[in-house]
């Protein structure tokens, strides 16, 4: 009825988050697929999910009985979304609608370039329909708003003022005056604040505008946000007015197209001429990765204390199943989380635990079901992929352990994976070696087998 030939939905949010809140799990709501990587294309006669090797088995199971077809990515003969759209529609232009709030500028430009190549420069149109599912998703969750928790400099090793001053100096060195920050982890780092707006991630859903004169934090429920010294809180939904009000003090504005969503980008272009909009990689990314002494101490503490919880868990599960207890994968996952929760400063898990036994342990990114998960037996292999969020650090640890006698194939695969990991850990690479070369070396002992994951 709107003249669209196709709708493209992604599994991200307005901040290009890897883990979106429940409100923006559009792919899951539409298809039932719960994997972290997936794009959906809907046309008048077709619905398809594009995902990679990590989720082929999961997607096949979850899409069974639906009208959604699985399209496999990162395999020989793959047909990407733009090429598929071009071949599916004979008439041109192809009219494609996207939710501009959940598509980064970089993603839309990649789509435009691919469509231009597949359909010709005049063979397509892309429409921005922000929150397009709002009218159909009756019980759609609201944008979350959790309490904001400022972090003391004793925990992070730097004050908020020091980090903002560093950013302003960095912007000046790069020929810019201001920056519009959209990635939630970067905002949390710059302001030394934490929240619980997204499961497993201690973030506050917000935007941040840093100019030479002011720092404006666009958040939900402004009146409930505690005062943050040196920061002015503004409403999350009034970006348009704020850009106009601060135009005079902003000057040359740096934006990162990999995290800036397309819809907000168009708002910026409405208020700032192209000459004043500078595209580039956020300087916060690298600076945030270089840990100061206090942060290093925090990470070491996190892994030590979380390691004790993990060792306690592994002892518990081994003695429990060998003692005849009926322990399911889900129950084991809950036990691991409970042991971690005892640690002072724990903010919960850093991602959904992967608790997998037997054949399930071989599945890339297995999702442990609450109901009907496998019973763990005193034989074969058990995998636990788990991590925690603490006020002083974040952990992520994977362990595959034999719980008793293993099959010949299990012993061979376990040994080859271990040898590959040892080989990789001892190897010396020239500076600048691509990450895919590491994968080639680590998997060299697999005798031609293909695992399709990264959790060896």
Segments predicted by a language model, with ranges:
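Active-site neighborhoods and metal-handling regions in enzymes and metal-associated proteins
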Residues: 1-456
């Amino acid at each position: 009825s709107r003249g669209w030939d196709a709708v493209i939905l992604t599994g991200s949010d307005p901040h290009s988050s890897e883990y979106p809140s429940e409100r923006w799990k559009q792919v899951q709501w539409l298809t039932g697929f719960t994997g972290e990587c997936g794009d959906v294309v809907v046309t008048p006669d077709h619905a398809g999910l594009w995902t990679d090797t990590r989720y082929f088995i999961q997607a096949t199971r979850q899409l069974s009985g639906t009208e959604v077809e699985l399209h496999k990515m990162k395999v020989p003969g793959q047909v990407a979304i733009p090429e598929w759209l071009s071949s599916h529609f004979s008439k041109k232009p192809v009219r494609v609608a996207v939710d501009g709030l959940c598509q980064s500028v970089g993603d839309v430009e990649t789509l435009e370039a691919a469509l231009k190549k597949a359909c010709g420069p005049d063979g397509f149109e892309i429409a921005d329909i922000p929150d397009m599912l709002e009218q159909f998703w009756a019980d759609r969750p609201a944008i979350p708003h959790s309490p904001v928790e400022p972090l003391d400099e004793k925990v992070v090793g730097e004050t908020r003022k020091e980090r903002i001053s560093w950013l302003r100096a960095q912007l000046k060195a790069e020929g810019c005056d201001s920056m519009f920050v959209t990635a939630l982890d970067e905002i949390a780092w710059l302001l030394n604040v934490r929240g619980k707006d997204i499961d497993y991630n201690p973030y506050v859903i917000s935007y941040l505008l840093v100019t030479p004169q002011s720092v404006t934090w666009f958040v939900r429920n402004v009146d409930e946000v505690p005062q943050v010294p040196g920061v002015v809180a503004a409403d999350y939904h009034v970006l348009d007015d704020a850009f106009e009000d601060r135009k005079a003090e902003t000057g040359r504005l740096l934006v990162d197209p990999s995290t800036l969503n397309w819809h907000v980008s168009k708002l910026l272009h409405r208020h700032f001429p192209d000459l004043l909009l500078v595209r580039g990689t956020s300087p916060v990314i690298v600076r945030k990765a270089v840990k100061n002494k206090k942060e290093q101490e925090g990470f070491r503490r996190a892994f030590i204390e979380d390691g004790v919880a993990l060792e306690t868990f592994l002892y518990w599960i081994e003695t429990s199943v060998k003692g005849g207890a009926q322990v399911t994968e889900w129950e084991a996952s809950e036990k691991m989380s409970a042991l971690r929760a005892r640690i002072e400063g724990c903010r919960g898990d850093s991602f959904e635990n992967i608790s997998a036994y037997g054949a399930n342990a071989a599945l890339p990114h297995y999702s442990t079901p609450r109901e009907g998960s496998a019973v763990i037996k005193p034989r074969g292999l058990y995998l636990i992929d788990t991590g925690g969020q603490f006020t002083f650090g974040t952990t992520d640890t994977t362990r595959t352990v034999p719980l008793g006698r293993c099959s010949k194939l299990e012993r061979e695969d376990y040994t080859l994976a271990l040898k590959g990991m040892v080989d990789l850990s001892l190897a010396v690479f020239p500076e600048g070696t691509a990450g895919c070369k590491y994968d080639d070396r680590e998997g060299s002992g697999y005798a031609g087998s293909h695992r399709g994951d990264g959790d060896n």
